[in-house]
């Protein structure tokens, strides 16, 4: 499963790679990382992802703006999009849902919960 993680915090890459070491080693999960909404869109122009995990609050293009762009790209098959935020902000969640987000996670990410959600997608 190809997963695109979009977050302006660069240490997120190390965190995901540590938590999914076994899945990366056996090839069941592949990660790509973008550190801005703009990088994510550039990646999606030439690659596909089954799942996109995007932070909501990022400098420049926010995760909500990215979500809107992703839905307009009409990717086939459409990726599942999960939004991640450090804030349990009901307003952001509602806006993301209206823009087409499939699910939500809060920071710090509960990786056991994320792995369960991945099983439902895969």
Predicted feature residues:
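Active-site residues of response regulator receiver
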Residues: 7, 55, 85
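Receiver (REC) domain active-site loop signature in two-component systems and cognate sites
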Residues: 58
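Alpha4 helix (beta4-alpha4-beta5 surface) of REC/receiver domains from two-component response regulators
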Residues: 65, 88-103, 113-116
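A short, hydrophobic beta-strand element within the central beta-sheet of small alpha/beta folds
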Residues: 78-88
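Active-site beta3 strand of CheY-like receiver
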Residues: 47-53
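Helix N-cap/capping motif at the beta->alpha junctions
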Residues: 33-42, 63
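A Lys-centered signature of the CheY-like receiver
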Residues: 107
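Two-component/phosphorelay signaling modules centered on CheY-like receiver
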Residues: 10-32
């Amino acid at each position: 499963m190809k997963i695109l993680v979009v977050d302006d915090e660069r240490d997120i890459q190390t965190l995901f790679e540590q938590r999914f070491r076994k899945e990366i080693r056996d090839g069941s999960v592949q990660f790509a990382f973008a550190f801005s909404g703009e990088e994510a869109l550039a990646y999606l122009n030439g690659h596909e992802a089954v799942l996109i995990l995007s932070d909501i609050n990022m400098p420049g293009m926010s995760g909500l703006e990215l979500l809107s762009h992703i839905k307009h790209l009409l990717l086939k098959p459409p990726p599942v999009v999960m939004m991640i935020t450090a804030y349990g902000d009901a307003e952001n969640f509602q806006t993301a849902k209206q823009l087409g987000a499939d699910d939500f996670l809060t920071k710090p990410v509960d990786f056991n919960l994320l792995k369960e959600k991945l099983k439902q997608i895969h």
